[in-house]
């Protein structure tokens, strides 16, 4: 895997009116990989993603992407730079067809021939776009809508895809398809940064993992290293309390 820093967080402090949620966050996202952020509720995971897409402006610090500081740039400017975020909540226009929704992803492109070529590639990558092209988006299940949202974001041909809890509300069958789709997007050349409630499954396909706790980076490593850490596994990934206690004891005596 390439290890070239693609996105770099340096001393990022950000939050809302009630105070700081992110507290001096430092880490890098490697180019060409999948990076998964895990941690307890309220640790700042979704806020971190919003700083990348311009929805939350850091109070302090810098976020570098391809040689440019994202801090202070609008969401539209960031979109034009090649960063697309798929929101946690479904965002399709229910009364428009699947194909119309997907085409909206290319709104920055004015050449109709280019749009048609992209749409043809998307149909190949996402069978649902071809099979349900003329159906209203509102007729799709939640999982099907999520796949169409993935397809729409790729119409922009982004360099970085940001995913906030993409598996939320999905049934086991669609969940499997969703993770396979994330892997496919990455293999197609997209760098992926995601927050995912099914952390174990997400870390298995991730090249890198970041653990947030109380707005700070507690641990970084490969996806496998984070997954195999007994203390992290017990606290955030559904492991046993005995594992956490044993890991903490060993750490205290090391």
Please report, for each region that a protein language model flagged, where it lies by residue.
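Conserved ABC ATPase signature
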Residues: 136-140
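The feature captures the beta-strand-to-loop junction immediately N-terminal to the Walker
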Residues: 38-40
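Conserved catalytic motifs of ABC-family nucleotide-binding domains
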Residues: 157
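Conserved ABC transporter NBD signature motif
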Residues: 61-69, 81, 115-119, 221
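ABC ATPase C-loop
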Residues: 153-154
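Helix-to-loop junction immediately C-terminal to a conserved catalytic motif
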Residues: 53
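ABC-type ATPase nucleotide-binding domains, specifically the catalytic core motifs of the NBD
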Residues: 17, 73, 98-117, 125-127, ...
